[in-house]
Amino acid sequence: MSRLQLALNVDDLEASVAFYSKLFATEPAKVKPGYANFAVAEPPLKLVLIEKRGSGGSINHLGVEVPDTAEVEAQQERLAQAGFATVEERGVECCYAAQDKFWVENTPNGEAWEVYTVLGDSPQACDGSRCCEVSAGC
């Protein structure tokens, strides 16, 4: 299953988790210090909340979660054929998860887009990969 990811900066993680739990009638899939994510079934959405006081209400980054690394590679190849520049990351730790991914470069409005798959849980927020720059504080 593929689904859209929306990563939001929030001022108050606890209040935001309470709000989105009610809005989507689901509990978060993962909660860590300064970080939470929801696997919303309907509509299919990965909602990520990153506590960044003073930046609440803004988009942190956007993404598409895909089922496996083969799909990450297929999407990266498709975008390369369409002329998109990408930055590949494999086996990185990002947002408390091990991931294979790539980032789309040079978006027209400067937003950060990733296509990724989750390989498993990770005890750390990030490992110095690009995720740490984009999601600083996740």
At which residue positions do the language-model features occur?
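Core segments of cupin and vicinal oxygen chelate
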Residues: 2-46
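Vicinal oxygen chelate
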Residues: 3-11, 39, 54-138
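Structural preference for long, well-ordered alpha-helical segments within the folded cores
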Residues: 18-19, 78, 109
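Short linear motifs in intrinsically disordered
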Residues: 25-30, 67, 90-94
